[in-house]
């Protein structure tokens, strides 16, 4: 079996994956798509599995698609990346299958966004369908703040950033929950605790990880959400609603896991390589 690790920025997670591949004596190459092209030819077909790890959604999506065209099994597939990389597409899949999500209104223009604010009521969350690390996710307390956010988003070149997901503001327990799944297995979950002077729990923004006990309802919600999007290696962000219980906030197709490892002591990279060897060895 030969594996290719696709990257654009080599973070701690990619170093851990490379180390796990070496320790498990798996042949592998690294292709940095920020520097190297991907040809549509049979050369890429020498790989059996591609681990897709670019930070950029579009680099991840397109590199996965090119490798799939060469007959390579990609983790994750371009279909999974396309759905998980766009929160509107994610919510559409989950809502159709009855998975709890935050109450959400989609607005595709500035005028529609103002109407969505009025329907939702303040405070509310407004975020675009694409993006990571809490970027451009706004807590809006009144219409004046809302108009400012809309004006700024209208100036952005990417049309997706002008789309608005208007949501209820769920502030409960001062944390959110991140879980990681590989294949059909839930590896575990941990809490991301909101830091001082912040309302978001992202580790990139200073959120601190802590271990939690996974109950059956949380496990059921996560496993079903993963199966709906056909994710093979994904993280799942969960909010705790005071009335609705666990709601799925988003799924990540190129999951970061250093905070998860600190909180749970689970070696995610090793688990990923074991999964690949068990399912795709030749």
From Swiss-Prot:
InterPro entries reported in the protein's UniProt record: ATP-grasp, ATP-grasp_RimK-type, ATP_grasp_subdomain_1, LysX/ArgX_preATP_grasp, LysX_arch, PreATP-grasp_dom_sf, Rp_bS6_RimK/Lys_biosynth_LsyX
EC number(s) stated in the UniProt entry for this protein: 6.3.2.-
Residues in ATP-grasp domain copies: 91-277
The keyword ATP-binding belongs to this UniProt entry's keyword annotation: yes
GO molecular-function terms, A-Z: ATP binding; coenzyme F420-2 alpha-glutamyl ligase activity; identical protein binding; metal ion binding
Chain positions recorded as Mg(2+) 2 binding sites: 250, 252
GO biological process: L-arginine biosynthetic process; lysine biosynthetic process; protein modification process
A GO term from the CC aspect: cytoplasm
Annotated pathway: Amino-acid biosynthesis; L-arginine biosynthesis
Cofactor binding, note field: Binds 2 magnesium ions per subunit.
Keyword Repeat: no
UniProt short sequence motif GF motif that is essential for ArgX substrate specificity, positions renumbered to this chain: 259-260
One Pfam family matching this protein: RimK
Top enzyme category: ligase
Domain of life assignment: Archaea
Binding-site residues, substrate: 192, 203-204, 256-260
Cofactor needs: Mg(2+)
Binding residues annotated for Mg(2+) 1, in chain numbering: 237, 250
Residues that hold ATP according to the record: 87, 127, 131-137, 167-178, 202
Record keywords: Amino-acid biosynthesis, Arginine biosynthesis, ATP-binding, Ligase, Magnesium, Metal-binding, Nucleotide-binding
The family this protein is said to belong to: Belongs to the RimK family. LysX subfamily.
Assembly, per entry: Homotetramer. Interacts with LysW.
Task performed by this protein: Catalyzes the ATP-dependent formation of a covalent bond between the amino group of glutamate and the gamma-carboxyl group of the C-terminal glutamate residue in LysW.
Stated name of the protein: Glutamate--LysW ligase ArgX
Species this protein is from: Sulfurisphaera tokodaii (strain DSM 16993 / JCM 10545 / NBRC 100140 / 7) (Sulfolobus tokodaii)
This protein's encoding gene: argX
């Amino acid at each position: 079996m030969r594996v290719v690790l696709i990257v654009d920025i080599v973070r701690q997670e990619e170093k851990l994956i490379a180390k796990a591949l070496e320790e498990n004596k798996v042949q592998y190459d690294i292709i940095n798509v920020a520097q190297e092209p991907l040809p549509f030819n049979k050369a890429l077909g020498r790989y059996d599995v591609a681990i897709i790890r670019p930070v950029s959604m579009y680099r991840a999506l397109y590199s996965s698609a090119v490798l799939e065209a060469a007959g390579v099994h990609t983790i994750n597939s371009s279909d999974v990346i396309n759905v998980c990389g766009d929160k509107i597409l994610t919510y559409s899949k989950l809502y159709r299958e009855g998975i709890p999500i935050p109450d959400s209104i989609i607005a595709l223009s500035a005028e529609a966004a103002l109407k969505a604010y009025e329907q939702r009521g303040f405070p509310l969350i407004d975020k675009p369908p694409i993006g990571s690390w809490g970027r451009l996710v706004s807590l809006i307390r009144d219409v004046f703040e809302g108009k400012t956010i809309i004006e700024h988003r209208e100036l952005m070149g990417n049309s997706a950033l002008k789309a608005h997901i208007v949501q209820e503001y769920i502030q409960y327990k001062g944390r959110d929950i991140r879980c990681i799944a590989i294949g059909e297995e839930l590896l575990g979950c941990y809490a991301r605790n909101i830091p001082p002077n912040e309302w978001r729990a992202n580790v990139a923004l200073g959120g601190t990880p802590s271990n939690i006990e996974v109950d059956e309802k949380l496990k059921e919600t996560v496993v079903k959400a993963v199966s709906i999007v056909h994710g093979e290696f994904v993280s799942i962000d969960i909010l705790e609603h005071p009335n609705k219980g666990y709601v799925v906030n988003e799924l990540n197709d190129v999951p970061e896991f250093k905070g998860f490892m600190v909180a749970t002591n689970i070696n995610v990279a090793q688990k990923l390589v074991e999964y690949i060897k068990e399912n795709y060895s030749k």
